[in-house]
Swiss-Prot record:
Top EC group: hydrolase
Assembly information from the UniProt record: Homotrimer.
Keywords from the UniProt entry: Hydrolase, Nucleotide metabolism, Nucleotide-binding
UniProt cross-references to CDD domains, sorted A to Z: trimeric_dUTPase
Name of this chain's protein: dCTP deaminase
GO molecular function, a single term: nucleotide binding
Membrane-crossing segments per the record: none
Gene label: dcd
């Protein structure tokens, strides 16, 4: 069952769920807790690659990704990152999240931002049981105007569901977990599949 605001506050107070820095109770509503945008971004560089063969040999896929992805772009507090129409960018939450083996999290974008064309997570909105780290956001601007994104602005909300029991393979214990303990806007690691 989805956790209520009272249960989220209790889970934060007793350390069942850890969000650092801890959100104020004002950031907790009904069934969710707001998360903010961090200051790290990555974009696709101008490139001449005609395509990336996602099912190709791992070294070739990784080499192609390395050619087209930018290094981390740091945006200081108070400044803005501009996401132009039709552009995809990776970013990271300001908060780091730790979940136990019996709770799954879900990230939702804000409706007010979606109404301007901003998709906060293109597809990956599940936060696995056992997750520990910052959450990488997959931004896409489907609107008509560039959007200024500033570090620490409220960007989405997390809600949580308690499972019927702990999972046997929590994310932080899996040997093949590609994004374990991520703290940066980590690019795709599909070559590790």
């Amino acid at each position: 069952m989805r956790l209520t605001d009272i249960e989220i506050e209790q889970a934060l107070d007793n350390g069942t769920i850890v969000i650092e820095p801890r959100p104020s109770n004002d950031a907790i509503s009904g069934v969710s807790v707001d998360v903010r945008l961090g200051g790290q971004f990555r974009v696709f560089k101008d490139h001449t690659a005609p395509f990336i063969d996602l099912s190709g040999p791992s070294p070739e896929v990784q080499a192609a990704l390395d050619r087209v992805m930018s290094e981390i772009i740091e945006i200081p507090d108070g400044e803005a990152f501009f996401l132009h129409p039709g552009e995809l960018a990776l970013a990271v939450t300001y908060e780091s999240v730790t979940l136990p083996a019996d709770i799954v999290g879900w990230l939702d974008g804000r409706s007010s931002l979606a109404r301007l064309g901003l998709m906060v997570h293109v597809t990956a909105h599940r936060i696995d049981p056992g997750w520990q780290g910052k959450i990488v956001l997959e931004f896409y601007n489907s609107g008509k105007l560039p959007l200024a994104l500033r570090p620490r602005m409220t960007i989405g909300a997390l809600n949580f569901e308690r499972l019927s029991g702990p999972v046997a393979r929590p994310y932080n214990k899996r040997k093949n977990a590609k994004y374990k303990d991520q703290q940066d806007a980590v690019a795709s690691r599909i070559s590790q599949d």
